[in-house]
Curated annotation (Swiss-Prot):
InterPro entries, alphabetized: L1-like (IPR004292)
Pfam families for the chain: Adeno_52K (PF03052)
Full protein name: Probable DNA-binding protein
Region (Disordered): 140-168
Gene Ontology molecular functions: DNA binding
Keyword check for DNA-binding: yes
Domain of life: Viruses
Sorted UniProt keywords: DNA-binding
Length: 205
């Protein structure tokens, strides 16, 4: 998991945050932020690979934290969702078939009216198309919306990455220490005695 986060020193005393706890929804990885609920409204979004904490404009931000999720868990959840969708389609077809083949639709001589009707045909087509689309899909990356790339704050890309950094934001969470600017403070998770799968960050401004 991640060892360090680098916070620009010039933003240390702009706000005073005390007691806010935001937790990553994945059970295997914990990410905590302590602050003031009135000063910070943290919203989280996950696409199984990345988590974004989105505070209001002008406040402290943690940008693009990667979450380690095994490919086996991701594949299991994807197959589970596909199986549920197929089962729902088949169940809907069964219910619709029972309605159209019920006793109220029988003729006076006891024969069942088996003529194709428009609602049944449309629902059947939608179920088949949905089932084929689900089974043919190869990825489960959500809506597939483009996401902004995280700036590269390595030694080679420091100059390029700093050009796109907005004031008041924390960038560069990685497995090694990354500096946003030369004048910065470091929060070392390893020294706090936390496990590599559960870390705590106290943003004390």
């Amino acid at each position: 998991m991640f060892d360090k986060i680098v916070i620009p020193r010039q933003f240390h005393h702009q706000h005073k945050w005390d007691k806010l706890l935001s937790k990553c929804p994945h059970p295997g990885v914990g990410f905590y932020i302590i602050g003031n609920k009135k000063a910070l409204s943290a919203r989280m979004r996950t696409d199984w690979e990345k988590v974004d904490l989105l505070p209001p404009v002008g406040r402290m931000a943690v940008d693009v934290m990667k979450v380690e999720i095994s490919s086996a868990d991701r594949a299991f959840m994807l197959m589970f969702v596909k199986a549920c969708a197929v089962f729902a389609s088949l169940h809907g077809l069964y219910l619709l078939n029972e309605v159209y083949l019920a006793a109220s639709h029988q003729k006076a001589d006891g024969k069942i009216n088996t003529t194709w009707q428009l609602p049944f045909v449309l629902f059947l087509f939608c179920c088949i198309a949905t089932t084929v689309w689900i089974l043919e899909s190869e990825n489960g990356e959500g809506d597939g919306a483009p996401r902004p790339a995280c700036p590269d704050f390595s030694t080679r890309g420091a100059e390029t990455g700093n050009q796109g950094v907005q004031p008041g934001a924390v960038h560069g969470i990685s497995q090694r220490e990354k500096h946003v600017r030369g004048d910065s403070a470091q929060v070392d998770f390893a020294q706090a005695g936390k496990s590599r799968l559960e870390v705590q960050v106290i943003l004390n401004f």
